[in-house]
Swiss-Prot record:
Gene3D superfamilies: Winged helix-like DNA-binding domain superfamily/Winged helix DNA-binding domain. The lineage of its organism: Bacteria, Pseudomonadati, Pseudomonadota, Gammaproteobacteria, Aeromonadales. Belongs to the UPF0502 family. This is UPF0502 protein AHA_2872. InterPro entries: DUF480 (IPR007432), WH-like_DNA-bd_sf (IPR036388), WH_DNA-bd_sf (IPR036390). Signal peptide: none annotated.
Length: 217
């Protein structure tokens, strides 16, 4: 697979995919909305604090790679960004909803077990059980390959999977940065839902402000 994304490029692409699925009425994203999505404290590993300048530089590089496009008109005051990572008319990468849900989570949170992926993708797609997640992961590992099964960590019941859109996985660096927690608690799930609702409201306000500016202009 020729495509290689840097860590911040993976974060931006993951955020654009996530918002396209979860909040389609606010997609494509403005730069401000994209910054908020990249810095979101829920469903992100690691949590980052990126500036508009940081994100603009990443977006410019992704536009150069033809993985992101500005859908706003040439004279528009506010650019709006849409990914062209997959499922485009002439693109090579075509994924089902389940495949895309898994890839999106891996881009946003790094290596995860099938159980974690089933729990965390419920806002992106649906799986009947972990066996179905295993089957989709096996398919993604055969094609491309797009994901890889990592060696099982000591004391863990399940192996984690990582995406390969950023090249081969550095196992030593991964082991040193391995997260201590596994499944999210119900309280964490509620917090995630609230944070996503806040981000959605922020995006709606931003969209209203842009439309008001256009009417006044």
């Amino acid at each position: 697979m020729e495509l290689v994304l840097g860590p911040l490029e993976a974060r931006v692409i993951g955020c654009l995919i996530e918002k396209e699925i979860c909040t389609p009425d606010q997609y494509p994203l403005s730069l401000n909305a994209l910054v908020n999505a990249c810095n979101q404290k829920s469903n992100r590993e690691p949590v980052l604090e990126l500036s508009e300048l940081d994100i603009r530089a990443v977006v410019d590089e992704l536009i150069r790679k033809r993985l992101v496009v500005n859908t706003a008109g040439f004279n528009a005051r506010v650019p709006r960004y849409q990914h062209r990572f997959c499922n485009t008319e002439f693109g090579e990468l075509k994924f089902t909803a389940q495949e895309l849900g898994i890839i999106c989570e891996l881009l946003l949170r790094g290596p995860q077990t099938p159980g974690e992926l089933r729990s965390r993708t419920n806002r992106l797609c649906s799986f009947d059980d972990v066996t179905q997640v295993d089957a989709v992961l096996a398919k993604l590992a055969e094609q491309g390959p797009y994901v890889v099964k990592l060696p099982r960590e000591p004391g863990k019941r399940e192996s984690r999977y990582a995406h390969l859109f950023s090249g081969e996985v550095d196992l030593q660096a991964l082991a040193e940065a391995a997260p201590a927690s596994s499944y999210a608690s119900p309280a964490a799930d509620r917090l995630t839902a609230l944070e996503e609702e806040v981000e959605s409201l922020k995006a709606q306000l931003q969209l209203l402000a842009e439309r008001l500016a256009q009417l006044e202009g």
